[in-house]
Amino acid sequence: MNPIYNEYLTFLRDTTKQPLEDLKEGYFWLDKSIIKGFDKQGNEHKFYRVKIENSLERLDCTKLKSYDNIADVNLASWQELIELQKEHLTQLEADSLELIKEKTEKFNTYTSIIPVSMGKDSMLTCHLVRKLYPETKAIFNNTSLDCADTYRMVKTFPNCEIMNPDFGFYQDVEINHMYPTRFARFCCRIYKVGVMVSQLDHNHPYLMWMGMRNEESNTRSSYQDEWVNEQEWGKTCWQGILPIRKW
């Protein structure tokens, strides 16, 4: 679920040719193509579905429920929702910080690094780890597929090493005739993980703080605090820790 900023609203208005005057920054969220908001009691209200035609040539926002005026719903702002959930969020943060301290002490001979994508989960993980250990190094794996804003962000992000592949994604497709599918997502295997695996010392003990959560998928629902990517890390002595898996 992503907060909807003015830039995205401008994109929607420009591409759908709809005024969408009832939408504004600071109150609405995009969740799996659904634009929704929450009232001040925390109840969810679904307003629009964002639909892209198969041709990718048309985008449309369709109202899901009859709201004569969305303004009639006493919507909570993002900040008000944070205040509504403040106790829960504070406890989540405290639990994560305690886990980070515990695992750092347990693996005290390991070198801590934080793989980051500039997305919400890895940025939250980085924030929590650096809250306790400010000098912890971050690593950004350049997939060659990220948007311009991501690259602008990573170039100014402190203490972050950018790991670049030998070939970009589309060069790889052309050279090796590899096409990604749901069951062969080689962009992740080769670019998001593979570049890091090829450049880090397999014999050095790294402690990797990973921004993965149990609620992301059925596969990740069973992950525990300590996790090792045996399939993609290969024969290494690396250890993964998931500080936000319960978020």
Question: Where are the regions a protein language model picked out?
Answer:
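Nucleotide-activated chemistry modules centered on ATP-dependent adenylation/adenylyltransferase
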Residues: 1-247
